[in-house]
A protein has these predicted regions:
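Conserved PLP-binding catalytic core of the aspartate aminotransferase-like
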Residues: 75-111
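Short glycine/proline-rich, acidic loop/turn segments that cap or connect secondary-structure elements
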Residues: 110-126
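Short amphipathic alpha-helices in soluble, non-transmembrane regions
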Residues: 107-115, 145-151
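Active-site C-terminal subdomain of aminotransferase-like
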Residues: 1-65
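PLP-dependent enzyme catalytic core of the Aspartate aminotransferase-like
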Residues: 124, 128-158
Length: 158
């Protein structure tokens, strides 16, 4: 601490002062830190490493985009938010798409919940449509269930 310089920082970022007083300026976000610990342990024990997580996430996204693109090419029943020709710009965490109108979109959301127990698919309020959030903790089996539902709903409503 001998070379301490007063840099004019606010006291929350003056780590010299905190170390000197053997105290911290504020309480750290302990719940967020604990949750992060649990997620990192899960990733280490179940997934192995970040490269494996990336492979799994790419696999989940590809599964949904392949179904959407295949059906779009046949009759444009599902309309991906980002077209296939721009697939390098597609999100692997949020797969967004539209149906042909608000009525069929509402029917899709209702049947997804009632028949397949798929919840939280309603798109962002400013964009509408459907948004499947397939973040790290979403198992591949759940994404497969959604892909099956997409095909089944299309077959019954095309």
């Amino acid at each position: 601490y001998e070379n301490k310089q007063n840099l004019g920082w606010c006291s929350a970022f003056d780590y010299y002062k905190q170390a000197e007083k053997n105290s911290i300026y504020n309480t750290p976000p302990v719940f967020a830190i604990y949750t992060t610990l649990l997620v990192l342990r899960w990733m280490q024990n179940e997934i192995g490493n970040l490269q494996n997580m990336e492979k799994i996430n790419n696999q989940k996204a590809a599964l949904l985009y392949n179904v959407l693109d295949e059906i779009y090419q046949q009759n444009q029943f599902y309309i991906p938010q980002v077209p296939e020709k721009y697939k390098e710009s597609r999100s692997i965490m949020n797969v967004s798409f539209h149906l042909q109108n608000a009525e069929i979109t509402q029917k899709f959301l209702q049947q997804a919940e009632q028949q397949a127990k798929l919840f939280g698919l309603k798109g962002h309020r400013s964009l509408g449509g459907i948004r499947a959030s397939i973040y790290n903790a979403m198992p591949l089996k759940s994404v497969e269930l959604l892909a099956d539902f997409l095909r089944d709903f299309w077959n019954k409503n095309k």
